[in-house]
Regions:
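Active-site nucleotide/adenylate-binding loops and adjacent lid/helix of ATP-dependent enzymes
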Residues: 114-159
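ATP-binding N-terminal substructure of ATP-dependent carboxylate-amine bond-forming enzymes
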Residues: 1-110, 127, 141-145
């Protein structure tokens, strides 16, 4: 079976290595990984083509790197995946700009920004009847004199 795609991972931490290993085990492919630093768990791996690029998570650099691979493999689909939150905005911002052979399975930047904003996300859940945990978003102006509309146990986490 001829492999008709090239996985491209943005980020060089253990998540990227694990995904590259999964692609190698499933398809026998070598994954291209873009990282910002020469020292990485991905550097020196036989299953990874590790490419160091400064400011790799910037919108312009993501487009530059992905376009480089698309031109290098014009006869294959290029599957772009971010391995870290800092890459999501840059990948989504470039959706309209990628070459024809690039697949980036992400939502538009507008939708991404809506989904990562907790209050907007829960409003969408309510609108479409999707269950979600009861939530209170604390705003600085609320001070200390507020009551939760539900009993514990509960989880408190910063946004």
């Amino acid at each position: 079976m001829a492999i008709e795609f090239v996985p491209v991972l943005l980020g060089s931490d253990i998540n990227a290595y694990s995904m590259a290993r999964a692609f190698h085990e499933a398809y026998g492919v070598k994954t291209i990984v873009y990282g910002m630093f020469p020292a990485s768990v991905c550097a020196g791996s036989r299953i990874i083509d590790y490419r160091v690029r400064e400011h790799n998570d910037r919108v312009d650099k993501v487009l530059e790197n992905v376009t480089e691979v698309a031109r290098e493999f014009p006869d294959r689909k290029i599957l772009v995946l971010g391995c870290g939150d800092n890459y999501l905005n840059a990948i989504s911002a470039n959706l309209p700009n990628y070459p024809e052979n690039v697949i980036a399975p992400y939502v538009s930047l507008d939708m991404l920004e809506t989904l990562i904003h907790k209050e907007k996300f829960y409003e969408l859940c309510d609108r479409y009847g999707i269950d979600h945990p009861a939530t209170v978003v604390y705003h600085k102006g609320m001070g200390h004199a507020f009551e939760l509309p539900f009993d514990g146990p509960f989880v408190v986490k910063p946004a």
